[in-house]
């Protein structure tokens, strides 16, 4: 029986990078006889233009029926002035919450070929391999009430709410421990337990879950210190688990240790490892349509999809090897280019990965 993959290119550079990822996926599908069927739909700004909402009901239903979702990027200045609740990003938040995609896995891996592209000294980041496990469907991005109001004195005031339940913390903590167990048995839980009530509960529950993982070394770190330590000595970390907002910020910070956010994939999983896969970067409207965006994060998201949702480790490994081979050849998009390398565009980079995959 065939497996269904829903492709959502999205906005900005999304359609450009997705085109290259789909080429790689179709080759892997054929070569490894994976039995995938691909369908395409719209999300974000593209959905607003077509349906008047950032995620149409029929698109959400197709996503529910699919075995995995492959996403490009959403958003852009074209839609910045519309009502907040129907902006493109709301489509992304909705599909995450409606599909129950509570666990976001964001690897930060420095390819040895890109050591010079990192913002830190090579000796600080050489061999870097961090996995950030981010809670994705709770916390301040979804908490109610949230409001902007006018006080009696005429001054505007806005507030948000940061709620976490014990069950939400427990399930993401287990993902963190499980990931640590298949890596190097080290987990750092990041919170702000010295200030926030939600973080105090977070730390208590993580400690309780740790009793089921005696082989995993657990440490705790306040988020401000974690942000500093990621720059000072990033290789002290292996797996980090944290809440929605902290994970959003720390994973972007970690991305720059690797040279470019254009290299980093991500997976968002439900309790059964059904997932949505997307690059960590945004829609980059400033370079959209120019054919210069880096498609490698999206291509590597395909690899994560094969690994986590379909248990196709051989095909996933092959795609990662193809990307590494292309970097060995000195091909670089502008975001990772350095002296002595050949600068290429989006399509040429995608074609190079396809060629490398064919020759493995």
Curated annotation (Swiss-Prot):
Root EC class? oxidoreductase
Q: Where does substrate bind?
A: 96, 106, 134, 224
- What would be one Gene Ontology cellular-component term for the protein? cytosol
Question: At which positions is NAD(+) bound?
Answer: 76-89, 282-294
Cofactor binding notes: Binds 1 Mg(2+) or Mn(2+) ion per subunit.
Which residues does the UniProt site feature Important for catalysis point to?
141, 192
Where is this protein primarily located? cytoplasm
Which residues are noted in the entry as Mg(2+)-binding? 224, 248, 252
Keywords annotated in UniProt = Amino-acid biosynthesis, Branched-chain amino acid biosynthesis, Cytoplasm, Leucine biosynthesis, Magnesium, Manganese, Metal-binding, NAD, Oxidoreductase
Stated role = Catalyzes the oxidation of 3-carboxy-2-hydroxy-4-methylpentanoate (3-isopropylmalate) to 3-carboxy-4-methyl-2-oxopentanoate. The product decarboxylates to 4-methyl-2 oxopentanoate.
| Assembly information from the UniProt record | Homodimer.
Identify the NCBIfam families for this entry.
Answer: leuB (TIGR00169)
Which family does the UniProt entry place this protein in?
Answer: Belongs to the isocitrate and isopropylmalate dehydrogenases family. LeuB type 1 subfamily.
Q: What is this protein called?
A: 3-isopropylmalate dehydrogenase
- What is the originating organism of this protein? Pseudomonas aeruginosa (strain ATCC 15692 / DSM 22644 / CIP 104116 / JCM 14847 / LMG 12228 / 1C / PRS 101 / PAO1)
Q: Which gene encodes it?
A: leuB
